[in-house]
Amino acid sequence: YITMHMKNGRANTLSQMEELIVQCYNHPSIAVWGLSNEITAASPVNDSLIENHRALNDLCHKLDPTRPTTMANVFMLDIDSPLLEIPDVNSYNLYFGWYLGELDQNDDFFDTYHAKYPDRCIGFSEYGADANPAYQSAHPEKGDYTESYQCVYLSLIHI
């Protein structure tokens, strides 16, 4: 369930989630069940979207009460969105310092979220900077696709 919500897709999302949980229930590497990925990138938050996520969340907990649920949210989802109240863990795909903004905005984003919701779990589900190993630079810059910038990016993310 990715990028765009379709009102007539609810039965399909529930069926796929059930198949996934039944198939992978005993897999040791599954820590959480993901409800959706960047679903608000091309869809507005509306009642249909919220109800579909509630149904998915309820189904996950019914079929596997031992694992939490999560959503991988795109950065522009409003921090007050009712969608954020549904999963057990809210995760974010953030590319500050690559597609937009500066690297230190990752820290600011998580600090702001945690200050507003100190009791909610949060995850960092996606981040990165594309690179071509053939591109090197003594003075790497955001967006230059050098492996040098990717190293700078990752060293600041992983401190």
Stretches found by the model and what they are:
Residues 1-103, 107-120, 131-145:
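Active-site mouth of glycoside hydrolases
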Residues 110, 150-155:
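Short, hydrophobic/amphipathic alpha-helical packing segments
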Residues 126:
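Conserved active-site aspartate in kinases
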Residues 158-159:
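Conserved small/polar residues in nucleotide/adenosyl-binding loops
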